[in-house]
């Protein structure tokens, strides 16, 4: 679910300014509002999906670590900042290079396989770990995994790079 939010924020957010070109021509308002609205819409969708996930966790009897659950809003906020930064960057570039909208679908798919979503980070060879850790979504997904699957409190300091990148962009 977190990856779907991130991926859809980038792909849909990249085309947001181009899609609303008629509105932009008619009314003056800060252009940043458009990608923000698209990313926020995807974020609300993710929050609603998390309600279903928590219901499944409770019904299945898997259990929840409530102390670890308190870190979930921080993880979500960092992911939101990163997705918003990427969406703003790609939406600005897409205005000049319209094909970027289509290329981003392929890029996010490749990015998904470079992020430990369907596999554990421990299977990555040690010599590739420095390169692997450059991916900001690796840290975000690892924190989600720690809270939801391992029921542990994640190391939130690993999220600083993702938050910093999102703010920088």
Q: For the regions a protein language model found, what residue spans apply to each?
A:
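Transmembrane alpha-helical segments that form the membrane-embedded catalytic/substrate-channel core
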Residues: 2-13, 80-92, 113-118, 122
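Short alpha-helical transmembrane interface motifs in multi-pass membrane proteins
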Residues: 2-7, 36-37, 67-75, 125-130
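Transmembrane helix boundary and interhelical loop/hinge segments in multi-pass membrane proteins
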Residues: 5-43
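Hydrophobic alpha-helical transmembrane segments
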Residues: 12-27, 48-57, 102-119
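Hydrophobic alpha-helical transmembrane segments of integral membrane proteins
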Residues: 26, 31, 69-70, 112-113, ...
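Alpha-helical transmembrane segments and their short interhelical loops
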Residues: 31, 36-107, 151-169
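Membrane-interacting alpha-helical segments
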Residues: 101-104, 111, 138-141, 145
């Amino acid at each position: 679910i977190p990856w779907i939010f991130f991926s859809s924020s980038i792909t849909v957010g990249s085309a947001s300014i181009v899609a609303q070109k008629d509105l932009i021509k008619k009314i003056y308002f800060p252009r940043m509002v458009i990608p923000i609205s698209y990313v926020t819409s995807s974020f609300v969708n993710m929050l609603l999906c998390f309600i279903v996930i928590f219901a499944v966790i409770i019904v299945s009897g898997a259990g929840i670590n409530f102390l670890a659950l308190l870190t979930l809003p921080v993880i979500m906020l960092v992911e939101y900042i990163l997705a918003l930064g990427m969406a703003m960057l790609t939406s600005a570039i897409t205005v000049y290079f319209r094909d970027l909208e289509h290329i981003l679908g392929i890029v996010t798919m490749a990015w998904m396989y470079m992020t430990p979503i369907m596999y554990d980070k421990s299977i990555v060879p040690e010599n590739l770990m420095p390169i692997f850790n450059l991916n900001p979504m690796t840290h975000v997904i690892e924190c989600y995994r720690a809270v939801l699957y391992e029921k542990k409190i994640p190391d939130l300091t690993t999220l600083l790079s993702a938050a910093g990148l999102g703010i920088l962009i």
